[in-house]
Structures are given as C-alpha cells and as structure tokens.
Amino acid sequence: EQMLDICRPYDGQPLTEVHIVGGVHPKMNLEFFCELVSKIRAHRPDLHIKGFTAVELDYMFRKAKLTVEEGMQKLKDAGLQSMPGGGAEIFHPEVREQICADKVDADGWLLIHETAHKLSMHTNATMLYGHIENYAHRVDHMSRLRALQDKTGGFNCFIPLKFRNKDNDMSDVPESTIIEDLRLYAIARLFMDNFANLKASWPMLGRQSAQLTLSFGVNDLDGTIDDTTRIYSMAGSEEQTPSMSTEDRC
C-alpha cells in the first residue's frame, strides 16, 4: 500500500511509465513483487511497468529456488513489461571484485537480460565509468553487451553512468572530467553500433552537460522524472532535486 501511495498522486497526469527499483530486502520475496506489479497494473493499466535490476532479480529467484526463466515468466505474467539496466557496473572480474563483490556477476547479469529478451521483454544496459576501471575494462564491458545485442536484439538503449564520489567508499577517487565524459559517449556511439539508442542520465551529469552529450552521439535523455525516492540526490548527482516534465526546457 505504501508503494501504491507513491503512484496515486499522479492519477490523472499524463505519465507513460513507472520505474521500480530498490535494494535487496531479505523480507521481500518474489511473490511480494509479483503482487506489487499486478496491483500497479490494476490501478493504472495504461502505464508501462519497468522494474527490477538484475541484482534484485538474482536474489529473488535464488530465494524462491526458481530458474531465471521461471522467475522472469512469473513477473511477466504479473504485468512486468521491461527491465532497467542497473547493476552492470563494470563486468570485468578484477574490477567487480573491488567495487561490487556481493552483486550478481557479469555472466549472471547477462543471463537475466538474455532470458528477458527471449520472453519478448526489452531491457536497458548500463556501464558505471570513471572510477578505478581502465579503458580495457570499458571495452570489455561494451563488447559483452554488443555481443548479446547481436544475439537477441533485446536492448532498448545503452546508458553510461558517471561515477560520483560523494558519500561512498570510493570518495577518494576523483571524478571524470566533462571532456572524458563526452569522449566516452562519442566512442560508445561508434562502438555500440547495434544499439539504436545512446542515453545520457541528465540528473547525474547536470542539465548543461547533458545538453552537450547530444552533440556527441546521445539521442535520448533519461528522463522525464520526479525523484520521489531521492535516489539520485543521495548518490551525489549533479542535480540535487532532479525533476523534469515534458513542459520543462533545458
């Protein structure tokens, strides 16, 4: 009911999508999230429901003792229509072990997304850059995504996510410069040639920097949002109160 209360204030507004992500909660299982999705679907059948990172899904399915395909099918039957790309971070194990050892590994992340694609659910792909990784790690990450896209064609977009060093265990790592950011977007546009869309996260980059990315291969900005959970601001985003509607102008 608390989660539905977040949706209710937007009744009657021209929304197109609800995006559901959260942590790995030990008391919440797959059945809970299936019920949540089905209730949102019943309340606003016009909304597209995108939800749950591969990290969350990996935990749900293991807890339920289900295969990835069985778990994904349950969520799809409940009304889930697509997935975000969170939790990818950097695929290379030597980096992943240092920054997110407890998260699902690269093979697990890719399997969950491939399974979603096989069930006709589109997903997004991300890469967290600008921390302790090097250029070879970035190329390895993008290569694995490109290979899966060649196989399934199920990715909607690729979203590079700029590392922010506020309030985390890597606060001593300097952030990438705007020049480095723009260079990465341009390379991604050329290298990820089988992805129709390259998306920039304007809350993380800031509105002005996000506008610049449109001249470096980006063709979509993520997104028209209302940051009700404070997830962007708590992560040290450039935009501390990120809210943008279709009526706003950069």
What feature does the model see in each segment?
Residues 5, 11, 143, 149-250:
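Auxiliary Fe-S-binding modules of radical SAM enzymes
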Residues 1-140, 144-148:
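Conserved Radical SAM active-site core
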